[in-house]
Amino acid sequence: TLLRSAAGQLPLLGGAVEVDGRDAASFQRREFARAVSFMPQIRSVPDIDVYALVCHGRFPHLGLSRHMTAADREAVELAMERTGVAAWRERNLRELSGGERQRVYIAMALCQESGNLLLDEPSAWLDAPRQFELLELLKSLAGQGKTVVLVLHELAQAMAYADKIALLSGGELRAALPPAELFASGL
């Protein structure tokens, strides 16, 4: 619910969301999608091949003709390579396992090339090696200046990879601290 609200998919009950210092409500839809990539925890499984689905991440960058440029195709290829799904380009999404689908949706979010990634349970459905690869990739993107916000229920993953952890309980923010400080606080 928190990430869906931040992504503008649910109305806020209070407060405001800012993206890069600007009120999120002031963005046009495509403009917001160029600034923020959102991957919800629960997604549909359309009857579509992997390449076509990943291409949907380029929507905010396409002009009126909706034709992809060489730069768009390059962004799709890079995202597919980074997530290890390039070999599945012609496979139907419905033929893939849950973990494989998860990687395809992550590729779609990455090829959007926004400065801010909101990912709800991105490591769900992934086996341990793929979880590690994903978290390393996201840490690398954060190191390159992207804002990466994850919902994780695995505290060990959050402690190992997060720069800051927000601890929520009963809909209330209990703390937002670097991992070592959160651990030392005893919360």
Segments from the language model and where they lie:
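Conserved ABC ATPase signature
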Residues: 67, 92-96
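Conserved ABC ATPase "signature" region
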Residues: 55, 70-88, 113
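Conserved ABC transporter NBD signature motif
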Residues: 12-23, 32
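ABC ATPase NBD coupling module
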Residues: 23-37, 65-69
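Catalytic Walker B motif of ABC-type/P-loop ATPase nucleotide-binding domains
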Residues: 117-121
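Conserved ABC ATPase "signature" C-loop
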Residues: 170-171
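Helix-to-loop junction immediately C-terminal to a conserved catalytic motif
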Residues: 7
